[in-house]
């Protein structure tokens, strides 16, 4: 595929799967976990990836919340590093534009890490 075909394929893939992506994001938002404790997020994301045909290796580098997912063979090789941790004290109800915690003092997502 040429560059424009690749671009169209990617946009179509995102559009075709937007409900799945949004549900995963919302699930991670509703279950905020601090750094190195993101077990729910890891299971959510790796399950989604495995169901989409990715090969997933969990516990990478001795970290139970780290994983590598691979799809296909050959080139191009595309990689990225992502975070899905919440921050302490940022509990926030979804769709609220003012401080409105689910639980006062609890962790929450304030940096978009749930959007992976």
Where do the language-model regions lie?
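Active-site alpha-helical elements of protease catalytic centers
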Residues: 110-116
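Acidic/His- and Gly-rich active-site-bordering loop/insert found
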Residues: 3-109
